[in-house]
């Protein structure tokens, strides 16, 4: 096969302006898909010859761009008489261009260039027509008003995805969750950047110093163990959330500042719970941290509300249900009410047994 040297030396300029090493395998795969899509058989020798022609013609092109490569593939296919395949390739190229345009329009309207990659992943994972981003764009634009801030536009985009969720198109709730998560992670990164903190240990130290994190976590784990635990984090597992689930977590369960600003990501929350649950393990403690984290972050198990809320925090009441026997005295009754309030404060459910209290009118 010709073009091997060019593949090593050449670079290609992508649509975002970045230059990356040129990979001829991508051309081969794209042409193979075009032939397969038309049900056309083509021998490996002829495919190699087509690829060699494309590469030889591209070797004189500086700078090399994605559009130039695609133009050359189309021309070579038609020169060799593969008109139906070339037509399918052109239509596929136009479809991809339309997908890019809607992504670009949404990202530009919001004012967030990093949103483009999130939208690209959505297009890859939700290919049914009912989840077309064109529908999201139309709904989003109906919510936009002059003078909206970037955060307000991002919120409107998420709201648009939520409103598109129906019984016939339930996966819009997962799309809405991805949009919400992107907005949250951007704000969260800015919060920590403003505080000059760049790693998990630094974040835990900051939260501990502010009284938001239990000091027992850093007392049980070394700096190196926290760094090891940080490697366990899998941000892509945020994609398992529905919008309602993620929204609830961000509002009620992740650690927040005194001014109600979330300072913990959902994955850091799961890891913090795992660190708490495994801290007294005698052997292979970090292995248990990873096991607990994986079970939680993959949604394989669900912890009780107090565990989700309080593990890793200063007041770590982890149990769900309590029963208190109310004594037959005024002091005892009010002491039970005091216990009820304290348990409820930290998320515990409370039951009260009044069997010891005499009925009204009984003999004293």
Model-derived segments and spans:
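Extended catalytic cores of very large enzyme megasubunits
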Residues: 1-364
């Amino acid at each position: 096969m010709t073009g091997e040297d060019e593949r090593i030396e050449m670079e290609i300029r992508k649509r975002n302006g970045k230059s990356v090493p040129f990979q001829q395998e991508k051309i081969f795969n794209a042409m193979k898909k075009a032939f397969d899509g038309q049900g056309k058989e083509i021998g490996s020798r002829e495919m190699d010859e087509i690829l060699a022609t494309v590469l030889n013609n591209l070797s004189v092109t500086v700078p090399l761009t994605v559009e130039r490569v695609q133009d050359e593939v189309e021309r070579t296919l038609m020169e060799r008489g593969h008109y139906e395949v070339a037509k399918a390739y052109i239509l596929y190229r136009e479809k991809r261009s339309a997908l890019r345009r809607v992504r670009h329009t949404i990202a530009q309207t919001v004012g967030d260039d990093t949103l483009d990659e999130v939208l690209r992943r959505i297009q890859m994972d939700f290919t049914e027509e009912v989840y077309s981003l064109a529908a999201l764009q139309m709904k989003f634009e109906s919510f936009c008003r002059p003078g909206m801030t970037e955060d307000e536009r991002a919120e409107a985009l998420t709201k648009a995805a939520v409103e598109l969720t129906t019984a016939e198109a339930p996966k819009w709730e997962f799309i809405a969750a991805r949009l919400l998560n992107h907005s949250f992670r951007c704000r969260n990164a800015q919060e920590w950047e403003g505080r000059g903190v760049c790693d998990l240990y630094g974040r835990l130290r900051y939260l501990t110093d502010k009284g938001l994190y239990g000091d027992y976590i850093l007392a049980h784990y070394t700096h190196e163990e926290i760094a090891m635990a940080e490697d366990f984090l899998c941000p892509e597992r945020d994609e398992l959330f529905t919008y309602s689930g993620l929204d609830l977590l961000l509002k009620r369960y992740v650690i927040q500042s005194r001014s109600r600003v979330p300072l913990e990501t959902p994955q850091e929350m799961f890891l913090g719970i795992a660190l708490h649950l495994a801290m007294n393990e005698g052997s292979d403690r970090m292995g248990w941290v990873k096991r607990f984290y994986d079970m939680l972050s993959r949604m394989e198990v669900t912890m009780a509300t107090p565990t989700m809320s309080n593990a890793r925090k200063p007041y770590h009441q982890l149990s769900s249900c309590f029963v208190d026997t109310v004594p037959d005295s005024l002091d005892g009754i009010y002491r039970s009410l005091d216990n009820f309030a304290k348990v409820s404060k930290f998320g515990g459910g409370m039951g009260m047994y009044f069997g010891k209290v005499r009925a009204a009118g009984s003999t004293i």
